[in-house]
Amino acid sequence: GRREKMRLQLHFGADYSAGAYGWTLDRDAIRASVDWQLRNLQTDTIDFGFLHCIDELRDLETAWGTLEEILRLKDQGVVRHVGLSSHTPAVVNRLLEEKVLDLVMFSINPAYDYSAGGEFAIGGAQERMDLYRRCEAEGVGISVMKAFSGGQLLDEKTSPLGCALTEYQCIQYALDKPGVLTVLPGVR
């Protein structure tokens, strides 16, 4: 069927139990969420199990239990690859030290890379480029999020760069970075 043609990415820590997006590091809530998603997606495997939205080193310290859960499911064959979603180079670098990551979901666009705007423009240009190179050197792929900065880069009035970029320019900018395997543009 169709499942063999798709790659499924689940974020451990994204919580929809209240009917809207939420974030949690509670292991029981995460287990319940993952079980619910597997059941509703009618699958027993997760191609990419992501430690979700860890942007502060203090959150990473709290999230070790979640990472252990992902690794446990990987040992059982439920999760195939381990990932991390973050906007913070220091957090990604810290987890790269553990040698457990296969993929990182990271925000890449010219505004963020050159600190031109947005709450997710974390880290300086050199720190961010060093991270991309490290991921490539260590065989950890990068899946890009926020390539359009939530649409801001596509509109001259909202672009922190002072001019509008095209979708093609934003996607190509991200694809040209070391380690980048794919760009996931947002949907409106």
Go through each PLM region and give its residues.
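N-terminal binding-site loop/beta-alpha segment at the start of enzyme catalytic domains
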Residues: 1-12, 44
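Structured loop/turn residues at beta-strand edges in well-structured enzyme cores
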Residues: 4, 32, 41-44, 77, ...
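Beta-strand segments within the central parallel beta-sheet cores of soluble alpha/beta enzyme folds
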Residues: 8-10, 47-50, 84-85
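Active-site mouth loops of central-metabolism enzymes
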Residues: 12-31, 57, 154-164
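Short, well-ordered amphipathic alpha-helical segments that serve as non-catalytic structural scaffolds
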Residues: 28-38, 69
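Active-site groove signature of glycoside hydrolases
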Residues: 36-58
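Beta/alpha (TIM)-barrel catalytic core signal, keyed to glycine-rich beta->alpha loops juxtaposed to Asp/Glu
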Residues: 54-188
